[in-house]
Amino acid sequence: LARNACILICCNETHVLGWYVCRYEHSKAWEVLLRRISPPTVVVSDGGTGFQKALKKVWLKAKLQRCLFYAFQQVKRYTTIRPKTIAGCELYGIARDLLTIHTQDHAVKWVQNVMSWKVRHRVFLSEMTVDENGTIRPKHERLIKAENSLVKLINNRCLFTYLDTSLRCTCPATNNRIEGGINAQLRAMLRNHRGMSIERRIKAVFW
C-alpha cells in the first residue's frame, strides 16, 4: 500500500491462513503473523525483510525455500537485462538458469558455475575506482552485490529445498501461488480504486 502501510500474507495451496498490517515489513511483524499459524513442514518466501529471522524464531523446524524467481530478479536488478560486461552477461545467464533446475545434479552443477564465475573474474571484480567524493570503492560494485546475493542464498541452503527427497510434501520452487493468485488480484483491485483512503484500502484488502 505504497509507503503508508504493508500487509503481510501467508497462504497454503487453497486458503489464506492469515494476514497482518504493519507500517513496513520487519521481523517483529512477521513474528506476530507466524505465531498465529501452525508451523508448516516447509515455507516458500520471496525473501522479504525480516522473514528469515522470524522463521528461525517462531517456526523452528520449518524448512525454507527461497523463491527462485525473486532470486533471479534480485540479480537482474543489479545487472539489468542487458549487462555491459562479459562478467555481467555470464552472471545474468547463471541467475536465469535457476529457473530451469529440476534435479539435484543440476543444482550441484549450478553452484559450481557460480563459484567458477567468481574465480574466473576475480581480477576484474577486484578493480577499484574513486567516486565523486574521493572515496575508493569497488569499480563493479553492483556486480559484486549481484554475486553476493546468490552466494548468500547458497550458504543459507535455501535455494533447492524443493529438490529435497526427504520432504513428505510437494514444495514449489517459487511463490507464484501467492504472487500470481492472491497478490495479483489485490493489486488489481487497489488500482481500480485509487481514490480510497488508506483505511478503506486496508479494509478492502481484508474483505
What is the predicted function of each stretch?
Residues 41-48, 52, 93-207:
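Acidic/histidine-rich catalytic cores and adjacent linkers
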